[in-house]
Amino acid sequence: MAEPTATREQAQQRMAQLRGEISEHDYHYYVLDRPTISDAEYDALFRELQRLEAAYPDLVSSDSPTQRVAGTAQEGFEAVVHDTPMLSLDNAFEADDLVDFDRRIRDRLGVASVVYTGEPKLDGISLSLTYQDGELVRAGTRGDGHTGEDVTANVRTLRSVPLRLRGDGYPGRLEVRGEVVIRKEDFERLNQARLDAGERPFANPRNAAAGSLRQLDPRITARRPLTLFTFGVGDPLALGVESHWQVLECLAGWGFRTTAPLEHLEGVSACQAYRDRLIEERDALPFEIDGAVFKVDDLAVREQLGFTARAPRWALAFKLPAREATTVVEAIVPSVGRTGKITPLARLQPVEVSGVTVARASLHNADELARMDVREGDTVMVRRAGDVIPQITDVVLAKRPEGAQPWRFEERVQACPECGSAVQRIEGEAAHRCVGGLYCPAQREGAILHFASRRALDIDGLGEKIVEQLVAKGLVVDLADLFRLGHAQLAGLERMGDKSADNLLAALDRARSTTLARFLYALGIPHVGEVTARRLAEAAYGLMVAVPRGDRAALRAAAGLDAQTAITSEALLRVMAAPADDLEAIEDVGPVVARAIAGFFAEPHNRQVVDHLCAAGVHWPEPDPPEQAESVSSLAGRAFVVTGTLETMTRDEAKAAIEACGGRVTGSVSRKTDYLVAGADAGSKLNKARELGVEVVNESGLRELLAGAGA
């Protein structure tokens, strides 16, 4: 709600100010890549504008940053007719094509040389944006060049598209042309998220951009990392400028991104050199390109040259070498990454793709392999983009050899191919993982770096380059070998002298003394971060309660350890021996995390490395067992969730009061929740609590519970 003292006029002024500030910050972040404020500061401005608009809904303007995303899905896309046709460009594939293009223009004009602009041809989706008096009123896809689809609601969600133009000097009606793309790094993150969620990845950034732009629900488009780069306008002469270069300068001044690298080029030789540079720099560009575009820069000269039936005479698209090629799958093999993820890889008959020889391609995971049904001997389409491992995008079924058999991951990969440890697929994950994280050679460097990290054992001076050498020379095979390193071994490494070796040995010696929480975190158990490791250490004596205190022999047996083990910490033994059901009862440990912990310690190789670490002198003060109090609080061990807005205390204060009485506060409602404390605007957690039959109390009810527990 707006401040009660704010008048309508004050609110209107503040809303206009906030719209301007937020739009300015969007421009710096999404167009210039130069953020001017922190995310928290931006969010505060955005929330303030939302509150004011909620208080004065009749003052909400269509160009407000809060109005980018429509709240409902569309039933379909209306047809939209372009003010000026969006014609194709003639294509060139050979150097002679470019020479002929330049010669035809010079002959037609009767001049010795022509000035062109050179720009990358982005591999995305072409759009036409129409602005009326500076405000975005329509966005359409290219379609057949004359008629496209109205995607205005979706395009409004793109932060690189100004809802209102910046500056001044624009005509009353302006049609802007551009290309919507997904940058390479955003595409990799998007596909990884889809794979992690068990969804089919996009074949390439162009397909991802096209699919994202044509969503019927703009809220889905808003979650996709789309960016617009502009390359011109429908009617450049309406801007009152003389060159294409000046058109692009106008667009940049009005708040748009333009493509880069953009160059002025005089003559065909300069164009050829620009094309060659683009080929060399292609992998370093943040977006995919499929060519270079050359346009006559002088707008008056363009008018003289005119158009053919399908394309302008003054522009040419020079295609770059293809990113895809056809080859044969010689074998499918599992590959173990640094985090233990096991990925099926296709070994290919070597094939050249855009100037690079490709001999392998990722098949992502078991589900994706089964969906694509790639088989050994198949002919496949392979795509390469930048430094990313090439991807198989399609199988040519017509060329499948007779007798080719499906490659079933679970049948072929029953143990880690690197170390023989068990393979685990945790519910909700798409990936299979080797559970021998402390033992597996493929994971060794990553395991050591995590073990030595600041929040783990904090071994100062043990960086990536040193770890690479230690592993390559065979000096560290398991983590305990770190504590057996000598001065001569360390001093002989690159970038290490006598003093550095002494410092690292001292850091290793200090690291022997730690805490159980840090030690558990340092082991790199999947899904176990600092908070979960601390919860495990604190709750250790509440695990394996059927085993009496002090009975380490029974705990060793339950944990799969023999009597000679160097592990003497009862708290650690209880964690190692605990079944998933016990672990799941710990705060912040759900079923997925519980199974990951139990699976980690069930792997004999991991237990062996933990044993070796304790034998090497890694130790910690034993956590104090919980005292058996004469009178136990009625809230001891009870699980609470606090949601909504409380009137007489903050949620942090409520949490502190509950924990002081022995209760615990979690962030989500489950069948293990005893009480939901519901304040105002409780929302979905209240609904879930009711569905599960969890007892719901208001703030007054919480105070009664606390009073009854002696608070």
Curated annotation (Swiss-Prot):
What InterPro entries does the record point to? BRCT_dom (IPR001357), BRCT_dom_sf (IPR036420), DisA/LigA_HHH (IPR041663), DNA_ligase (IPR001679), DNA_ligase_AS (IPR018239), DNA_ligase_CS (IPR033136), DNAligase_adenylation (IPR013839), DNAligase_N (IPR013840)
**Which Gene Ontology BP annotations are present?**
DNA repair; DNA replication
Active site as annotated: 121 (n6-amp-lysine intermediate)
Task: Report the EC code(s) recorded for this entry.
Answer: 6.5.1.2
User: So where does Zn(2+) get bound?
Assistant: 416, 419, 434, 440
Q: Which cofactor does it need?
A: Mg(2+); Mn(2+)
NCBIfam families xrefs: dnlj, PRK07956.1
The protein's name? DNA ligase
The species is: Halorhodospira halophila (strain DSM 244 / SL1) (Ectothiorhodospira halophila (strain DSM 244 / SL1))
